Amino acid sequence: MCAGYKILILAYLTTEIWMERQYLSQREVDPGAEFTRNHTISEGTRFKRAVFEGQYCRRFGCCADRDDGCVTQFYEADALCYCDKFCERENSDCCPDYKSFCREEKGWPPRTKPWSPEGCHRDGQHYEEGSVIKENCNSCTCSGQQWKCSQHVCLVQPGLIEHVNKGDYGWTAQNYSQFWGMTLEEGFKYRLGTLPPSPLLLSMNEVTASLTKTTDLPEFFIASYKWPGWTHGPLDQKNCAASWAFSTASVAADRIAIQSQGRYTANLSPQNLISCCAKKRHGCNSGSVDRAWWYLRKRGLVSHACYPLFKDQNATNNGCAMASRSDGRGKRHATTPCPNSIEKSNRIYQCSPPYRVSSNETEIMREIMQNGPVQAIMQVHEDFFNYKTGIYRHITSTNEDSEKYRKFRTHAVKLTGWGTLRGAQGQKEKFWIAANSWGKSWGENGYFRILRGVNESDIEKLIIAAWGQLTSADEP
């Protein structure tokens, strides 16, 4: 039995020695021409290759002793070749430049590190060097395997939205897709557009409504409830800096409809003001409300249906498309057809000189209740763009770089009413109802509520109104 085990062990050792010799001899035996191309390393075998000129070991590096991993691509033969010390045995599977490079007296260069693609990664995706991606309002460039991003303050700040929504501030914020990708400065530049009030406008005497002081003012009032069909909803100025034109045209249209008791209910054209009133006819680059009211008095506007908004406000052919003449009695009549050929009525609507309403909360309420909506000049802060619902009050940015994040600019809106709510603690909260000009997808169907009686964001500082310029034939 013991002799049998010895025979088996001896046979096993003999087989192992034979296989090792066969393995070592593979680099010394040419298996034939059919293996000289298009072969990879077999298990335990390295086939011979055809010899070509080129730099292989010089690029890859040389390896001491036998190293089957010391291999590089032999492009001319579509194969692999070796640069290890085993090549001293005159094997033809070695790279052509092994002898000329690896046998030199100087030290061998280190082996090339395994190739890894250059570039950057973001969200599981690889980007090549020089690639540029957009992250909200900032551009990020892949440079030196790192992302280098601009540091603009974005109009949509997720951190600020979260801060507002987690706090008990009385209103909620939302991320609006139309604002995503814009910087805060771009929001101020394109979504507002009203210039700060001129000294002439601020020096106007305040006028109080003739409504008696004893008249009860309701806790809740909306102009459209008192004058249904005579007031007009919000439009969308898009990226045209013309809140000065939108608010002026809308207030004038409401006032003319109310004064004529529904005889003239057309919404007036802000595009008429944008294209014809502003200097150099570039009204999307901001304008003043006093200039807009001057134009309404001296030149007048056609309806929004007659002169609709241009799709491309930057087009070179957006010059003034309306002309009119005076009849000598203060009324003007259009001398050109409507830019919208479908609309036939090119009637010109005019207003009296504007007047300033008292900044007193009660006086503003009386004016709206007696004569209709008014124009308010307010200050827009960075958080206002994200308003969704509730009673707005400015919430200071939590960002440490306060000077960079806390900014404001002038905006013009239309006040249409007011109301009162009970707060979470049971306290009474008063608010104004205002129409913005950022479309109906923003805020509360295009409207917003804002604290009343405390001049929140200067909403009560400058209130403007006007009468429609109607003749005896126009009035009911």
Swiss-Prot record:
Keywords: Basement membrane, Cell adhesion, Disulfide bond, Extracellular matrix, Glycoprotein, Secreted. This is Tubulointerstitial nephritis antigen. The keyword Membrane does not apply. One of its GO terms (biological process) is cell adhesion. The record marks 49-50 as: Cleavage. Residues 59-107 form the SMB domain. One of its GO terms (cellular component) is lysosome. Glycans are attached at residues 38, 175, 314, 360, 455. Disulfide bonds join 63-83, 87-94. Transmembrane segments: none annotated. It is found in: Secreted, Extracellular space, Extracellular matrix, Basement membrane. It holds the Pfam family Peptidase_C1. GO terms for molecular function: cysteine-type peptidase activity. The keyword Mitochondrion does not apply. Mediates adhesion of proximal tubule epithelial cells via integrins alpha3-beta1 and alphaV-beta3. This is a non catalytic peptidase C1 family protein. Its main location: secreted. Gene3D superfamilies: Cysteine proteinases. The gene is TINAG. Belongs to the peptidase C1 family.
